[in-house]
């Protein structure tokens, strides 16, 4: 394919950042860190980043075997990867994780803060322990991942935080703690996009709707009236018909593809934004 040339502008503000054409979507030569990458959405993020040319640091807290499988799969697909164990609920672990990541591959271009926990419960029943469990990972953890990302990312790096449509959706019962923990991330992104602009780092949030991971059916049942009586297939049918005009359910790859867009040159003019990825469930 012939090289695509950039038009000659009259001032420095006319210069187009990065290549034109399909090359602008490439992640070749980039290094990414994905937290909570041993399973679910984080696993697919790591896999897709690897497929597109990234070297990937696969973070995990407990699932050693799963994380090693992700690393092996990325290598099999032709890129490189390594595991780093760290609990993002512990700031000292976060600091060490970033230091190890840079030692392994020499730099960081992309950080995907994916780790999270889910919680359901009527506000009258929420204990201080449950509140702290959720906010420690979903909110405090993401903040300090972002802090260390700023310190270690290359100029022009990418920080992608994990939100949820529950941070915006109305009338979600028994979900105040989880929704609040994710809603804070949206404010983080808007403020951090300003703070991190001095290093030309973009900061965005992906906010998934229901995504079919290992927790999918159990979580969906909390949203569906009498959901506890439905089979997994019936849950899928309900979700596809009631929650999306596209009549299908969301998959981890749907999130990973948007993450890769934000991580590439194509996403370079997007910052401080919350990207809802829910198949039209929240319009």
Swiss-Prot record:
Keywords recorded for this protein, A-Z: Melanin biosynthesis, NADP, Oxidoreductase
Domain of life of the source: Eukaryota
Record-linked Pfam families: adh_short_C2
Amino-acid positions noted as binding NADP(+) in the UniProt annotation, renumbered to this chain: 39-63
Any single biological process term in GO: melanin biosynthetic process
Residues bound to substrate: 164
UniProt-listed SUPFAM superfamilies: NAD(P)-binding Rossmann-fold domains
Subunit structure: Homotetramer.
Designated name of the protein: Tetrahydroxynaphthalene reductase
Source organism of this protein record: Pyricularia oryzae (strain 70-15 / ATCC MYA-4617 / FGSC 8958)
Record lineage: Eukaryota, Fungi, Dikarya, Ascomycota, Pezizomycotina
């Amino acid at each position: 394919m012939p090289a695509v040339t950039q038009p000659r502008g009259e001032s420095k503000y006319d210069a187009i950042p990065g290549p034109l054409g399909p090359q602008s979507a490439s992640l070749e030569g980039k290094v990414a860190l994905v937290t909570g990458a041993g399973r679910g959405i984080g696993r697919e993020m790591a896999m897709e980043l690897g497929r597109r040319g990234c070297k990937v640091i696969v973070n995990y807290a407990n699932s050693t075997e799963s994380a090693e499988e992700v690393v092996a799969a990325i290598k099999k697909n032709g890129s490189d990867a390594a595991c780093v164990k760290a609990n993002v609920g512990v700031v000292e672990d976060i600091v060490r994780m970033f230091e190890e990541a840079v030692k392994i591959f020499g730099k960081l271009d992309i950080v995907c803060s994916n780790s999270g926990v889910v919680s359901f419960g009527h506000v009258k029943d929420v204990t201080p322990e449950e509140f702290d469990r959720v906010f420690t990972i979903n909110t405090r953890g993401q903040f300090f991942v972002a802090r260390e990302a700023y310190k270690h990312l290359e100029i022009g790096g990418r920080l992608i935080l994990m939100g949820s449509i529950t941070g915006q959706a109305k009338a979600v019962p028994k979900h105040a703690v989880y929704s609040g923990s994710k809603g804070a991330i949206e404010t983080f992104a808007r403020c951090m996009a300003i703070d991190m602009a001095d290093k030309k780092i973009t900061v965005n949030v992906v906010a998934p709707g229901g995504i079919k991971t290992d927790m999918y059916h159990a979580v969906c049942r909390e949203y569906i009236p009498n959901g506890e009586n439905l089979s997994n297939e019936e849950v899928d049918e309900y979700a596809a018909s009631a929650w999306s005009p596209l009549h299908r359910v969301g998959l981890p790859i749907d999130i990973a593809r948007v993450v890769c867009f934000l991580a590439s040159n194509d996403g370079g003019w997007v910052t401080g934004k919350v990207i809802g990825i829910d198949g039209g469930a929240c319009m």
